[in-house]
């Protein structure tokens, strides 16, 4: 009898785990951010979420991840990238936005059961890295203001997070404590969030029920664990000195200074506390 009960408990736990690996909703978000030249980005992200876990990602990038998840597919993709880079070098101008690439290689996986986020990203064009972060680094102050987004009544909340002040709008009508990027921890789904300077934000433009699997990241074993601030410092160094990054990889080119993108401290990342 005891063995039967144990089996049933294990069976029920297995069912629960399997159920929790599926999303309840899928939300599409438009990113608000700008290139160094002031041009607005036009990136799209999706959030697959249920009450205990979620995955935030760019669907185009995940499609490329799928195509390059085999050795042959990855080799073909790298050949295409190298050919594009050599063509740009021959023209005397490098624009990485025109290279075959993952449009936005960022993945944010959240687990409320563990109160941990796992963030996967790429340094440069070919260094997969990841780090983890506790939920406790984000705390909110809920206000009184309300507005309607996609037909849902939303409530204002504010937080100071990793160097920027953010204002979010969440709806208790969808009781999933999640949102775009790393945002979480409010008593309802976050449909809009913007930083005080207007340089970054996310706005929901579609919500639907979903039973899609919340899978991990393709090739997760290839990602190297790093420190969050160290990753941001490395990204900043690459942005400030892209030629040095190429030369460190054995790519020696001569590009006139006017063909290199200019960056300044005002053109900073979404997180600024790495300095």
Segments (PLM) and residue ranges:
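Bacterial Sec-dependent N-terminal signal peptides
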Residues: 1-25
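Extracellular or lumenal secretory-pathway regions
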Residues: 20-137, 143-146, 153, 198-275
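Hydrophobic residues in beta-strands and at strand termini
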Residues: 142-143, 170
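Structural motif
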Residues: 149-150, 161
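Gly/Pro-enriched, hydrophobic low-complexity segments
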Residues: 155-218
